[in-house]
A protein has these predicted regions:
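Beta-strand-rich ligand- or partner-binding modules
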Residues: 9-143
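Strand-loop-strand motifs at the edges of beta-sheets in extracellular beta-sandwich domains
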Residues: 1-8
Length: 143
């Protein structure tokens, strides 16, 4: 038999050592118990838009805001592109602008796809950071 955790249940399991005990009882009332120990150690996560947000013309500026817990020792990288429909988008690092809620002006002026589109991605790595370390929301706008 297989024990399956839903993605939502797995996300709620905190990093660290855990013990899982499974007891099976057969039709005769006999039981068998197995105990397994495992360690969960999620050290990074990336959130990214899967489809480009549409733009009627070339986006030239944006404001992006990232909320969460970023303890000393962790690493946060926030990137954006205005040619998100391209096979190889031009990602621009806007980490400091996002953390300080500052406007960013795109440096990219080219696209290979037929339409402009914006994509955002944020990567958080725990590094040596301790305590809560997570991204709770990403938002913003562009023009």
């Amino acid at each position: 038999n297989t024990l399956t955790f839903s993605a939502d249940a797995w996300r709620k399991v905190l990093n660290g050592s855990h013990t899982l005990t499974i007891t099976a009882t057969d039709s005769m009332g006999l039981t068998s118990t197995r105990t397994q120990t495992f360690t969960k150690n999620v050290a990074s996560c990336t959130f990214a838009t899967t489809s480009a947000l549409p733009a009627d013309a070339m986006p030239d500026r944006c404001v992006v805001n990232v909320q969460g817990a970023f303890p000393a020792g962790c690493s946060l990288k926030v990137e954006i592109c205005n040619n998100g429909n391209d096979a190889s988008p031009t990602w621009e690092d806007i980490t400091q602008n996002a953390l300080n809620n500052q406007k960013y002006f795109f440096t990219n002026k080219t696209k290979t796809a037929s339409a402009w589109g914006v994509k955002i991605r944020a990567t958080l790595s725990r590094g040596t950071g301790s305590g809560e370390c997570y991204i709770s929301s990403i938002g913003g706008n562009y023009q």
